[in-house]
Amino acid sequence: MAREYKIEDYRNFGIMAHIDAGKTTMTERILFYTGKNHKIGETHDGASTMDWMEQEQERGITITSAATTTFWQGQDGKKRRFNIIDTPGHVDFTIEVERSLRVLDGAIALLDANAGVEPQTETVWRQAEKYHVPRMVFVNKMDKIGADFYRCVEMVGSRLGAVALPVQLPIGAENEFEGVIDLIEMKALTWDGTIGAAATVGEIPEHLKDQAEEYREKLIELAVEIDEAAMEAYLEGTMPTNEQLRALIRKGTIEVKFHPILCGTAFKNRGVQPLLDAVVEFLPAPTDVPAIKGIDVKTETETTRESSDEAPLSMLAFKIMNDPFVGSLTFARIYSGKLTKGVSLENTVKGKRERIGRMLQMHSNSREDIEEAFAGDIVALAGLKETTTGDTLCDPLKPVILERMEFPDPVIEIAIEPKTKADQEKMGIALNRLAAEDPSFRVKSDEESGQTIIAGMGELHLDILVDRMKREFKVEANVGAPQVAYRESITRQAEIDYTHKKQSGGSGQFARVKIIFEPHDGDDFIFESKIVGGSVPKEYIPGVQKGIESVMGAGPLAGFPMLGVKATLIDGAYHDVDSSVLAFEIASRAAFREGAQKAGAQLLEPIMKVEVVTPEDYVGDVIGDLNSRRGQISGTEARGIATVVNANVPLANMFGYVNNLRSMSQGRAQYTMQFDHYEPVPTAVAQEIQKKFA
């Protein structure tokens, strides 16, 4: 089977926005107009196609990015292939946005015409900057009360620090909104609002002609700056033709020099078709963006893979999903080469082979089996055993590791336990499945309490995972309050001489150990034996180490694991009959418990590296608040039009911070935090913790 669409006719793009900017409705309209959907699903009916998990339909927010393939016939009469990735707009799901931006070539940023640039728009925009993704802006909900296109254009400059390039102007606003002025063709496009209606092309209304002329002039001035020859011709009085103007806008958009701005209302079916034409005209094909970089596994040097079917096969797994019918599905973007069903591929990150069983083309929640896929395609693969998000799959003869995705460490953890014995086993399976799907979600077992601890990016993130466990895996669980992972250590040297003796008829137990315990700089446990002359026989020494290690998990102050301890065995004694590995294990355990007390045990707490990105107006409040949380400010710097505040803050004082920050900055500041190091807890705080846990 040969390639049906040339790679130049592909557009891989996503729609990104703040929660409630109308993203799902827009995707629905796109799917409708491109002929994939016969009935439009409205978000407020809970019947939308892209939001296919039950909770998304209930909450009316998009959580998982579903990938959809669809087709559009442009104004030139040529059919193009669109691969659309839907992304969530809630701050706890930024990981989903990151992973979808990673595999896109372009994006449409949706703005609510009334609210303009909202906090999550800023976050997502910054993430797109990081991956250098070309973007257009669509000002949606132009029919809403308070809709203001020109304010939105101004905010793209002032809030996002981006160059706005309006290619359309609205005709009317709020309930008077009728259509748009196309500034390239200088025509008015109006719609009667019925579903599927084509635009009526007419002359620009008299009262808007001057404004349209003024904005067209600005458009041309910005566009010709992209190309020296066009600039010279323009300065000499030659205007670019409409075709040349489109080519200049395309070039500037792909080079991320500016962002075309369009407008309309997806819900009322006005402005959707021109947006689809703009995707074709201004957003890049896979061949228009730089070739993906990677590391050649054989030579360990940097290499690139061109977007071509002839290049060796390379693809990136960007999402894993559990499908109720097919099981585990791995979504992957093919960057180069050709993929055939049944072939064996190398997972270069894991060093394992994977065989491609079923290969599917996804349409939101329906699917079709395919035999072959090509460079530029986004496919879903069934039956992969080892592959997780961010892994590279490639031709085993030409192995490469593509740029890896970076995932933040979880910042909040809660204890979770099954409600019944029957839920116990199901919970383990459910949590492992969810962790395989979502790299920002971790599961571990707390050895002291026997509880299962889950960790994630925020409270909503964990809420939804617990909820999914209930629905998809039918597991009922009790959830605890968020917790901090404290540690313990020692502050000075202590020498302990301990004898373990037990005699009760028959063979007894005997072991004597002399051990020096001292702190060291690392976090790990170091054991050393300085026994000479056989005072402790060689075969018993591993028992001494094992005994100490077995009690390192629970320190003397509040039962937290111990860090940074060195133990040196310097002397001991044994009995020919009564000594054993077990006896030395018991002796060293008791020696450690005594030694930890004498060596000045102390509590340690996790210190987080916190970065707050805030508009200038709130810097003082942000710094004051971080100081009140026992934070230490390490510096501030300007980033675009925002200020970045860096600080080290104890995790214990960061719970509920997101809500504080939102109210302090009217929702305009965001923060990220990750674990940095452990530090001794101040005495007053340590006493509180000991009371609570001892």
Swiss-Prot record:
Domain tr-type G spans what residues? 8-287
GO terms classed as biological process: ribosome disassembly
One cellular component term (GO) for this entry is: cytoplasm
Stretches of the chain forming a coiled coil according to its record: none
Q: Which UniProt keywords apply?
A: Cytoplasm, Elongation factor, GTP-binding, Nucleotide-binding, Protein biosynthesis
Any idea where this protein resides?
A: Cytoplasm
Q: What CDD domains does the record tag this protein with?
A: EF-G, EFG_III, EFG_mtEFG1_IV, EFG_mtEFG_C, EFG_mtEFG_II
The record describes the protein's role as: Catalyzes the GTP-dependent ribosomal translocation step during translation elongation. During this step, the ribosome changes from the pre-translocational (PRE) to the post-translocational (POST) state as the newly formed A-site-bound peptidyl-tRNA and P-site-bound deacylated tRNA move to the P and E sites, respectively. Catalyzes the coordinated movement of the two tRNA molecules, the mRNA and conformational changes in the ribosome.
What this protein is called in its record is Elongation factor G
**Organism for this UniProt entry:** Brucella anthropi (strain ATCC 49188 / DSM 6882 / CCUG 24695 / JCM 21032 / LMG 3331 / NBRC 15819 / NCTC 12168 / Alc 37)
